[in-house]
UniProtKB/Swiss-Prot annotation:
Keywords: ATP synthesis, CF(0), Chloroplast, Hydrogen ion transport, Ion transport, Membrane, Plastid, Thylakoid, Transmembrane, Transmembrane helix, Transport. The gene is atpI. Belongs to the ATPase A chain family. F-type ATPases have 2 components, CF(1) - the catalytic core - and CF(0) - the membrane proton channel. CF(1) has five subunits: alpha(3), beta(3), gamma(1), delta(1), epsilon(1). CF(0) has four main subunits: a, b, b' and c. This is ATP synthase subunit a, chloroplastic. PROSITE patterns: ATPASE_A. CDD domains: ATP-synt_Fo_a_6. It is a multi-pass membrane protein.
Length: 247
């Protein structure tokens, strides 16, 4: 009973995280919900960039790929290799999910450094990378949790829950908490790194000449790409773990 109560509190805490705010926000009222307008605007921009670039690159696919098509085929091959390494031979159905997570996070992270969001003035707050907001990272982490539960239940049925008493039933509470802390770690890791990177650049730009922060900005681009890779790798690893039943 205590384990169930603790798990319930963990889920409630994860939901409450969406109320965390850093700075001012512009709010939109959609139905009965109040949403952060900055996150929606920048997320739509990122999605438009992804859809537009893919459409332009592969609208006339060639047998021998060139330019944009060649680039996206390389990206697809990279994501397939990543999924196969972490999930195993049954990786195929999960490539679109892992690829979507990786590309959205990667472009979102880079948009914070490369796009001139600050030039767009809002009544309240300012635009920034979508992953700069905890709501976005939680929204990315929760489907990942659903995905690895779904993968395990689809592969093993109710026998999937047997992993919680392995290697001994004494570890039942810890094994349950482990699954509920995975989305927490995914969301906070991504949010914290992207927010910290943008704050460091803003502080340096305000304190020293423009040329000095440039190396830090390049480092930020590198770490932003690494964060996207880490998120996608962990998501694939969790799915593979739930299907194999080992840690």
């Amino acid at each position: 009973m205590n384990v169930i109560l603790c798990s319930s509190n963990m889920l409630k805490g994860l939901y409450d995280i969406s109320g965390v705010e850093v700075g001012q926000h512009l709010y939109w009222q959609i139905g009965g919900f109040q949403v952060h307008a900055q996150v929606l605007i920048t997320s739509w921009v990122v999605i438009a960039i992804l859809l537009g670039s893919v459409t332009v690159a592969v609208r006339n696919p060639q047998t021998i790929p060139t330019n944009g098509q060649n680039f996206f085929e390389y990206v697809l091959e990279f994501i397939r290799d990543l999924s196969k390494t972490q999930i195993g031979e049954e990786y195929g159905p999960w490539v679109p999910f892992i690829g979507t997570m990786f590309l959205f996070i990667f472009v979102s992270n880079w948009s914070g450094a490369l796009l001139p969001w600050k030039l767009i003035e809002l009544p309240h707050g300012e635009l920034a990378a979508p992953t700069n907001d905890i709501n976005t990272t939680v929204a990315l982490a929760l489907p990942t949790s659903v995905a690895y539960f779904y993968a395990g239940l689809t592969k093993k049925g109710l026998g999937y829950f047997g992993k919680y008493i392995q290697p001994t039933p004494i570890l039942l509470p810890i094994n349950i908490l482990e699954d509920f802390t995975k989305p927490l770690s995914l969301s906070f890791r991504l949010f914290g790194n992207i927010l910290a990177d943008e704050l460091v650049v803003v502080v340096l730009v305000s304190l020293v000449p423009l040329v000095v922060p440039i190396p830090v900005m390049f480092l930020g681009l590198f770490t932003s790409g690494i964060q996207a890779l880490i998120f996608a790798t962990l998501a694939a690893a969790y799915i593979g773990e739930s299907m194999e039943g080992h840690h």
